[in-house]
From Swiss-Prot:
Zn(2+) binds at C271, C276, H278, C284. This is Small ribosomal subunit biogenesis GTPase RsgA 2. Belongs to the TRAFAC class YlqF/YawG GTPase family. RsgA subfamily. The gene is rsgA2. One of its GO terms (biological process) is ribosomal small subunit biogenesis. CDD domains: YjeQ_EngC. It holds the Pfam family RsgA_GTPase. One of its GO terms (molecular function) is GTPase activity.
Length: 346
């Protein structure tokens, strides 16, 4: 086994490390240790604490990271990343999930898990990661007519390739395998029970992952993946599995949102006011599209929701933005008090 088989390309080879160190890739993350594979072996490594003491949590190694590792199994540094997937927790802190992948596979099942709002959220973080998003719709055998699902995807994921697969019959995998570049790293995103583990087994051609069935009463799956882990498949693809995430916060980088909602962003360019909030201003092209049916209310409301969420996280992480928002509301409240004092009495 060579490190090149684990995606060690020139981008990482050109990043210099000490002559006494080795290049490695993190294949699993545990509480206090990291599983690392190098050119010669695979072992558990720990952080050299002094090198990471004052760094943020996003500077710590994640599954998929290439690292500099010492002869005594200590991680000395993390190499520059090509792509990264993170999420915001309830305290508006960024949590790193995976790094250095080529494709972000958004896995949803064609049962009660299929949710356009959640799909738009996943697409936002997938585009923001820098990787190519792909939609995987599992349990296609449960649906007789896929037309309705295809039409819904057109409204929120235009241009993003979607594959309808059946993990049992292997239907749909030939097209996916034909389109994926060889030796690529894939990260799987999706809720628990959508069939991510079964999907990996089908892609690998063997029972690599432990799987569990779904409850018949609500079509929800049992949770089988408990930590983030990388797998090298015999066909050359590298797969990063992640625990199911039904709800997660988006960050405050607008790039992913603008790509996912490119149709709304294009409409917004036609608004009369450059700072239009797209809620009540005259001459709003977005509101006009709502009225004539060009834009659906669900798509619009989810866009606004994610916009507000990003703005909230940005303020939480930027004292200047938080202060600016407080000052804005002070002006609004002052104007309201002045209006109430000067309005004619009845």
């Amino acid at each position: 086994m060579t490190l090149e088989q684990y995606g060690f390309t020139n981008f990482f080879k050109e990043q210099k490390i000490a002559a006494t160190s080795s290049y490695g890739r993190v294949t699993a993350v545990f509480r206090d240790y990291y599983r690392v594979i190098t050119e010669n072996e695979e072992f558990l490594a720990s952080l050299k604490r002094g090198n990471f003491y004052e760094l943020s949590s996003t500077s710590l190694p994640a599954v998929g990271d290439f690292v500099e590792v010492s002869s005594d199994a200590q991680i000395l540094s993390v190499l520059e990343r090509k792509t990264v997937f993170s999420r915001m927790n309830k305290d508006s802190e960024e949590q790193l999930i995976a790094a250095n992948f080529d494709y972000a596979l958004i896995v949803m099942s064609l049962n009660h898990d299929f949710n356009l709002n959640r799909l738009e959220r996943y697409l936002t973080v997938a585009w923001d990661s820098g990787a190519t998003p792909i939609i995987i719709l599992t349990k296609a055998d449960l649906v007789e007519d896929l037309t309705a699902f295809a039409q819904q995807l057109e409204t929120v994921a235009y241009g993003v390739p979607a594959y309808y697969v059946d993990n049992l019959s292997h239907h749909g995998f030939e097209a996916l395998e034909r389109d994926l570049k060889p030796n690529s790293t894939l990260v799987l995103l999706g809720s628990s029970g959508v069939g991510k583990s079964s999907f990996i087994n089908s892609l690998a051609g063997t029972d690599l992952m432990k799987t569990a069935g779904i409850r018949e009463d609500d079509s929800k799956g049992k949770h089988t993946t408990t930590h983030r882990e990388m797998h090298l498949l015999t066909n050359g693809w590298i797969v990063i599995d992640t625990p199911g995430m039904r709800e997660f916060g988006v960050g405050f980088n607008q790039a992913g949102l603008e790509t996912t909602f490119s149709d709304v962003e294009e409409l917004a360019e036609g608004c009369r006011f450059h700072d239009c909030s797209h809620t009540q201003e005259p001459g709003c092209a977005v509101k006009a599209a709502l009225e004539d049916g060009t834009l659906t209310m669900q798509h619009y409301e989810n866009w606004l929701k994610l916009q507000r969420e990003m703005a909230y996280h940005a303020r939480k992480n930027s004292p200047a933005l938080a202060r600016q928002e407080r000052d804005r509301w002070k002006v609004i409240q002052k104007s309201l008090r002045t209006h109430l004092k000067t309005r004619p009495k009845k």
